[in-house]
Amino acid sequence: MKVNDVELIIEGAGPKVIVMIHGWPDTYRLWDPQVDALKAGYRCVRFTLPGFDRSAPRRAYSFAELLEILRRVVEETSPGKRVILLLHDWGCFFGYQFAMRHPELVERIVGVDIGDAGSRENRAELGFRGMTIVLVYQLWLALAWKIGGRLGDGMARWMARTMRCPTDPRTIGAHMGYPYAMRWLGAGGGLQGVKVFAPQCPMLFMYGKRKPVMFHSRRWAERVAAQPGSRVIEFDTGHWIMVQRPRELNEAVLGWLAS
C-alpha cells in the first residue's frame, strides 16, 4: 500500500491500529522488535519517513506536506477509528504536531525519548553546555544535507558514529538531515507554526537517562505523569531504548495499552 509515494508496511491483526514513526537516522526497520511484540493484538503500520530512503532524491519536504502525509496514512489505514501513535526522535516531533492538529484521529500516544524539546523549560535545564551540544550536532547534520554527495554522506555517518547510533551505517546519508535543515536553514519553508507539545490524550512517555542532553524538561514530564491514564518511565539507556532494551520497552508498551 502506498500513500503519496510512501510505501506502508502493515502487519498484524486486531481492532486497533498503531502507527509507528521513526526519526534520524533510521528507517521503518527500527521498529522490528516492537512489531514482533505487538502484531498479535494490533495492526502495526510503519514506513520510512519521506526522503529518508537512499533510493529517493535528496529534497526537503515542507512541514505542511509531512503533516498531510501523516493524515492520509492515519485515515487510510484506520478509516473512522482513532489510532495509537508510537514515536521516536523526529517521529515524535512530527507525530506530536500532528496529534495537536488532529486530536480526533489520535487515541493514545507512546513517545520515546523526545518530549518538549526546544521549549523554554527544556532550554533552561540544558544550560549553555547542553544548548551548545544540540546546536553543534544539529547544524552539522543540516549542513551535511545542504552539501550532499559523498562529503555530506560522510559527515552524516561520522555524526552517527559519534552519537553511537545503532543504525546500519550503509543506510545513513546526508539526505536524512532535511528536518535539521528545515529547523536551522529554513529548508522546505522551515518550521512555521510549531507549538510546544501538550498531550490532549493519554500518553506513555519513555526516556533514556544516559545521554549528554535531555530532550524534555522535568516539569513537562511531571505534567504528563499527572494526566489521567498517562505514565512516564525512565530507562537506564541512551536515546535508542527500543534497540538497547527492546524487551523492557515492549513490556511497558503492552502493559500500558492493556491498562
Which stretches of residues belong to each language-model region?
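Catalytic histidine-centered segment of alpha/beta-hydrolase-like enzymes
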Residues: T237-P246, N250
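Residue-level signal for the nucleotide or nucleotide-sugar donor/cofactor binding architecture
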Residues: D26, Y61, E65, Q244
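C-terminal alpha-helix
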Residues: V73-T77, A252-S259
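The conserved beta1-alpha1 loop
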Residues: V19-G23, H88, Y207-G208
